[in-house]
């Protein structure tokens, strides 16, 4: 399997060239299909579950951290379909999602692309409606909640309803990692049961000369505790879920978000966060945490395989605690979405790959082993193995618990195409730096949301 980890000028297929510039950001609203090209239809009229026996290349464009997983999935798919060559290309997540409209609106496009939000892509008919493939492969008989975030209404905006435009191998889950040895030093024998317990532990860590919480503020890690604090203050997930799914009239500029921003800013003021929090990215944060910098690290299950190996059994995981003991836990989740660009000429092969990564036992195991993501798929599909008591097993157990209790909600970052890089990242940086107030922060989030939805 051929693999690239950067995006130089290259030929996606012999004789076909595209300049690929650098699965949540700007430009989506302004980049539609070029007017010189023929009108698009996003719904295939002739689909097949047979991919034939002619040699073909399937180009898969994902974020760089996902490359090892898709390399493994591609190799497994090639073993089943030797006439298919899966070519995986990786790019920085923010850069990739910023440039998705350009990457899929030309005549030379990847066959599968990692998405985090849909923006104008559905409205501009740049993504393939997967409903015909869902019928052909039997996805319609699977639990449908797994597809909620990748359904888009006829208005091209509201999610959770309408046609299916994406699917993926597994699901993310947020929570808090903790260093067991450092926790023992501050007298913490079990994960905090309430937000107050967590804050008390962070104060003890500071008093002991330890960094209370490692966070990657450079590329959005501050949004994880922020959203959990918002859901705690709002007494549930409905407000933020309606907002995430672009439900008409949804508004996040509420006392709950102001309260959440106030708490997060307070953590910074108290010295609970790294002094250089706004320059720490998602590669540096887990590495520094695994080396013993920080008692706590809010992040997602995609970090579990690496931290399990690097931490030597000294790292645990717990769900973000509620305000009061006994209240339900909540967490953010999203499918690792792959979409088929309308202009791809390998729709059937791409759909076959999507079906394979959701149903093949080996592919499902790789999804958990390499990226820590519990797979979706058919209700009767076998569950991947994880070592009892391991960090990965702990994240899987947490996911199953929240799945059953309806405590999972999409990421605020996925609400619009520009929300992550253009709004949440810079606004949370300003917040923890003390350069904006909680009320100004809350208003700015809603303002940018409304601007993106125009």
Role assignments for model-derived ranges:
Residues 302-305, 324, 336-418, 439:
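Mature extracytoplasmic/periplasmic domains
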Residues 79, 162, 186, 270, ...:
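Extracytoplasmic/periplasmic substrate-recognition and gating elements
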Residues 1-58, 79, 450-454:
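Short, low-complexity disordered leader/linker segments with a strong preference
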Residues 159-169, 174, 199-249, 294:
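Extracytoplasmic/periplasmic solute-binding protein
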Residues 245-277:
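Glycine-centered hinge/linker elements that transmit conformational signals in sensory
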Residues 246, 331, 393-449:
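C-terminal capping/gating helix-and-loop segments adjacent to ligand/active sites or protein-protein/ligand interfaces
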Residues 76-149, 184-186, 190-193, 288, ...:
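Extracytoplasmic "Venus flytrap"/periplasmic binding protein-like
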Residues 118-174, 225, 316-318:
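Hinge/lid segment of periplasmic solute-binding proteins
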């Amino acid at each position: 399997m051929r693999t690239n980890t950067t995006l130089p000028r290259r030929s996606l297929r012999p004789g076909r060239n595209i300049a690929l510039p650098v699965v949540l950001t700007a430009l989506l609203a302004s980049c539609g299909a070029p007017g010189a090209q023929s009108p698009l239809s996003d719904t295939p009229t002739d689909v097949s579950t047979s991919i034939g026996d002619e040699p073909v290349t399937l180009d898969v464009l994902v974020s760089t951290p996902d490359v090892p997983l898709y390399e493994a999935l591609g190799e497994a798919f090639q073993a089943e379909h030797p006439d298919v060559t899966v070519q995986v290309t990786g790019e920085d997540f923010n850069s990739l999602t910023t440039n998705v409209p350009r990457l899929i609106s030309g005549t030379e496009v990847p066959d599968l692309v990692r998405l985090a939000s849909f923006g104008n892509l559905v409205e501009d008919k740049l993504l393939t409606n997967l409903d015909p493939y869902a019928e052909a492969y039997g996805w319609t008989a699977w639990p449908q909640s797994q597809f909620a975030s990748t359904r888009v209404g006829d208005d091209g905006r509201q999610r959770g309803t309408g046609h299916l435009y994406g699917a993926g191998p597994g699901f993310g889950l947020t929570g808090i990692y903790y260093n067991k040895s450092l926790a023992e030093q501050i007298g913490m024998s079990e994960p905090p049961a309430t937000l107050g317990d967590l804050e008390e532990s962070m104060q003890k860590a500071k008093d002991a000369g330890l960094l209370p919480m490692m966070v990657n503020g450079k590329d959005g890690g501050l949004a994880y505790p922020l959203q959990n604090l918002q859901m705690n203050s709002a007494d549930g997930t409905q407000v933020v879920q309606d907002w995430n799914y672009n439900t008409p009239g949804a508004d996040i500029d509420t006392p709950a978000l102001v309260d959440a921003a106030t708490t997060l800013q307070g953590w910074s003021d108290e010295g609970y966060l790294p002094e250089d929090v706004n320059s720490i990215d998602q590669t540096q944060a887990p590495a520094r945490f695994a080396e013993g910098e920080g008692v706590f690290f809010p992040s997602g299950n995609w970090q579990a395989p690496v931290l399990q190996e690097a931490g030597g059994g000294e790292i645990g995981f717990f769900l973000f605690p509620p305000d009061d003991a006994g209240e339900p836990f909540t967490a953010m989740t999203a499918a690792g979405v792959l979409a088929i660009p309308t202009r791809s000429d390998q729709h059937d092969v791409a759909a076959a790959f999507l079906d394979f990564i959701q149903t093949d036992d080996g592919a499902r195991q790789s999804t958990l082993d390499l990226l820590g993501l519990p797979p979706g798929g058919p209700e009767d599909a076998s569950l991947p193995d994880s070592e009892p008591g391991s960090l990965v097993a702990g994240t899987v157990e947490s996911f199953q618990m929240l799945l059953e209790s309806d405590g999972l909600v999409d990421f605020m970052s996925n609400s619009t195409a520009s929300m992550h890089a253009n709004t949440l990242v810079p606004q949370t940086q300003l917040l923890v730096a003390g350069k904006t107030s909680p009320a100004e922060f809350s208003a700015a989030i809603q303002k940018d949301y409304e601007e993106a939805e125009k």
